């Protein structure tokens, strides 16, 4: 099995209660399952102001969001092991965990897994795509020792 290299950037005013670099690496590795060599991605933990600005600029949505995924698009003739960037909003993740009555650490793990799958090209725009992605997320999360993240919706 290959190795995940995570460039963790903390751009949140409050760093307490955030997952560790080792946890984020474990969750991303479970989602990406690199086969050989090294695979790199950036995980940036931000506050609502930055999340809101990025969500507005790139998706036209006028509010912060839990996770944004920016896949690295490399020309075919160039081989670079870069997956892309995840931008995760601390306050949105904390609020959602509370609203959904989930352990905070489980929701952090889910956001890293969910975002990592987006970097691999998975999507949830169409119902069949959403079903496939949610099934894969559930499988990965349960493999990590967490409960089904969609349990409350079933």
Swiss-Prot record:
This protein's UniProt keywords: Cytoplasm, Endonuclease, Hydrolase, Metal-binding, Nuclease, Ribosome biogenesis, rRNA processing, Zinc
Predominant subcellular localization, coarse grouping: cytoplasm
Cofactor note as given: Binds 1 zinc ion.
GO biological process: rRNA processing
Cofactor: Zn(2+)
Intracellular or extracellular location(s): Cytoplasm
Entry keyword annotation includes Membrane: no
Domain of life per record: Bacteria
EC number, UniProt record: 3.1.-.-
GO CC term (a single one): cytoplasm
GO terms of molecular function: metalloendopeptidase activity; RNA endonuclease activity; zinc ion binding
Pfam families per the UniProt record, alphabetical: YbeY (PF02130)
Entries under NCBIfam families matching the protein: rRNA maturation RNase YbeY
Protein purpose: Single strand-specific metallo-endoribonuclease involved in late-stage 70S ribosome quality control and in maturation of the 3' terminus of the 16S rRNA.
Family indicated by similarity: Belongs to the endoribonuclease YbeY family.
PANTHER family: ENDORIBONUCLEASE YBEY, CHLOROPLASTIC
The protein, known as: Endoribonuclease YbeY
């Amino acid at each position: 099995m290959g190795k995940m290299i995570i460039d963790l950037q903390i751009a949140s005013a409050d760093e307490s209660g955030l997952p560790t670099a080792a946890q984020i690496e474990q969750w991303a590795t479970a989602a990406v399952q690199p086969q050989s060599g090294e695979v790199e991605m950036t995980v940036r933990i931000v506050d609502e102001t930055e999340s809101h600005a990025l969500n507005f600029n790139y998706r036209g949505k006028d509010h912060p969001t839990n996770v944004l995924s920016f896949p690295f698009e490399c020309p075919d003739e160039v081989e670079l092991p870069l997956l892309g960037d995840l931008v995760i909003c601390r306050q949105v993740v904390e609020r959602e965990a509370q609203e959904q009555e989930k352990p905070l650490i489980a929701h952090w793990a889910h956001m890293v897994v969910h975002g990592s799958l987006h970097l691999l090209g998975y999507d949830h725009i169409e119902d069949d795509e959403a079903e496939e992605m949610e099934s894969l997320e559930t499988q990965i999360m349960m493999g990590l020792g967490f409960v089904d993240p969609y349990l409350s919706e079933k």
